[in-house]
Amino acid sequence: MNENNVALITGSATGVGRACAIRFAEEGFDIVVNYSRSKTEALETKSLVEAEGAKVLLIQCDVSDDAAVQAMIGEVSSEWGRLDVLVNNAGTTEFIDHKELDELSEEIWDRILGVNLKGPFFCVRAAAHLLRVSEFGSVVNVSSTAGIDGRGSSVAYCASKAGLNTITKSLARALGPEIRVNSVCPGPIDSRWLKRVMTDEQLAEETSGYPIPRPSLPDDIADTVLYLSLGTTLSTGQLLVVDGGRTM
């Protein structure tokens, strides 16, 4: 069995996932870096994590594929024999105006729900036997305020995150006390994902009226994920909003 604690962060090639991988490595964890298509970026994350002194297991897996998820967790088990923290960060969306109902095809619905909703469930189900025997088994789902207030990149994305918030509560009841399950709900994140549709100026204007008038950074979310994993032992089934006070 691996001597160090182990964290698996899905979708950790870039952005919030990469920030989480580095943050846990700084805390002495060895890291499972998961990616679906972004191998070049995942290798960059691997190098950054290794620079913190951590060991890295790099695994390609589309979390919407249940069999692939089972294989990923099987590899973690065979290589390291433990898993202490699961961060369900992998996500996808399409930027579709909510009024454009006809643009939201069944194919888009299936892809978004597959990655954002089914994927976290598949990962928890596959990893539960490892998390149960950890001294502090923890699942943190990276959700969104879109799942709370219905404002987001598409109707399907909002629905997927609302579902993830509910799954968080259901699994917290089902898996406690051995495993805690919580969600972090960011607002707008200053990342390349959002910058596909917003300039820096537009993002600054969007957040200018918030009580804390700036967008979240990947490190803000990583710090929250770390807190929910290690900084509290009595919180489960909770949605922790990190959006500068927009959502109250």
What residue spans do the PLM features occupy?
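Substrate-binding pocket helix/loop in short-chain dehydrogenase/reductase
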Residues: 97-110, 206
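Conserved glycine-rich cofactor-binding loop
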Residues: 13-14
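Short, small/polar-rich loop/turn modules that mediate ligand/substrate recognition or access, typified
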Residues: 82, 176-180, 235-237
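Residue(s) in the substrate-gating loop at a strand-loop-helix junction
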Residues: 144
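C-terminal substrate-recognition "lid" of short-chain dehydrogenase/reductases
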Residues: 124, 217-242, 247
